[in-house]
Amino acid sequence: MSSPERKRKKRSLEPSPESTPNPSLPDDLIVSILARVSRLYYPILSLVSKSSRTLVTSPELYKTRSFFNRTESCLYVCLDFPPDPNPRWFTLYRKPNQNITEKTKNSSGFVLAPIPNHHSHSSSIVAIGSNIYAIGGSIENAPSSKVSILDCRSHTWHEAPSMRMKRNYPAANVVDGKIYVAGGLEEFDSSKWMEVFDIKTQTWEFVLSPLAERFIYRSLVIEGEIYIFGDKVVTYKPKEDRWGGVGEHQSMDLGLFFHSYCVIDNVLYCYRPGGIKWYESEKRSWRKLRGLKGLSKLASSCVKLADYGGKMALLWDKYIPCSGNKSHSISCAVVSLERCKNQGIRGKVEWFDDMLTVPSSYNFVGALAATL
């Protein structure tokens, strides 16, 4: 039988877990592993260490994600909080410390988290790849030609070449990787009413147009054709450089009555009190989107729809009674869409949850998805 002194001596020779060598994995292997993880978890991973924060924003990681075909849509939301002139951006993340117990309480496990860098003014927004473009708008109550880019990989802003004309909240749409901007001018000049930004050459060029509407209520793109809804409704096909009217699809006019709309897989969806509808081109009529259990009683003065990687992101607000109606709660739902045998479209609510509490004075600027 060994003595206690001998036991202590023997134990002291055994290496402790803290002193055991743990060589770091090569960066390229770590990048390969992280590239296979959903980006929804990157904010949690960035809390691990300084090196992990660097890795989750590195260009190499996103190149690897693309190589492995692991790119995904990431939802971004822009809000105004008067009197602060600077809009604030939020993005959909997985909640940190989400556990099994919480999931059993009907929690989605998602949260709208603020990104640290703010954009300097409100503007029209579009997304191309991993970048969100903020175009024109108003700076100190004057139209602006400024174009800023939010790099969604690193959540940093940088400037792009300015437009040729100053525009106050123009219509902005993306066709074949180019940004077409129309309206928002103080002068009625059809030769300058629309211009296009080529991302590859980083240049702006005017697009000759037959009209010069100051106010544009809505604009969208279906099958490569831009639809512009103002006092007049016109269409433009960039590939053919051809202008036209809505014609047989006059019933598609969104006018002023639709609170929100989006195009998903070349199908137009819109919301107005009573529910969400989609436009059936063949019959030239609106049809109700079925299958939205739990959202049928949705009634809000502020509803936003967005294409979320082929699914629909639906955001709305509601008063918080205990706040004396001084605060709103912003909720989010993700809806998958499926074509039915009868040529209809049916939605399925994958999840919905309260995301964010905001003051009642806020303004909902927009929601869109970047690809990362």
Curated annotation (Swiss-Prot):
Q: SUPFAM superfamilies, from UniProt?
A: F-box domain, Kelch motif
Concerning CDD domains, the annotation shows:
F-box_AtAFR-like (cd22152)
Keyword presence, Repeat = yes
Protein name as catalogued: F-box/kelch-repeat protein At5g49000
Give residue ranges of the Kelch repeats. 131-177, 179-224, 226-271, 273-312
Q: Where is the composition biased (Basic residues)?
A: 1-11
Query: What InterPro entries does the entry give?
Result: F-box-like_dom_sf, F-box/kelch-repeat_ARATH, F-box_dom, Kelch-typ_b-propeller, Kelch_1
Q: Where is the F-box domain?
A: 19-65
Q: Which Gene3D superfamilies match?
A: Kelch-type beta propeller
> What is the species listed in this Swiss-Prot or TrEMBL entry?
Arabidopsis thaliana
- What keywords sit in the KW lines? Kelch repeat, Repeat
From the broadest rank down, the organism's phylogenetic lineage runs: Eukaryota, Viridiplantae, Streptophyta, Embryophyta, Tracheophyta
Question: Where are the residues of the annotated region Disordered?
Answer: 1-24
- Has keyword Nucleotidyltransferase? no
Q: Name one Pfam family in it.
A: F-box
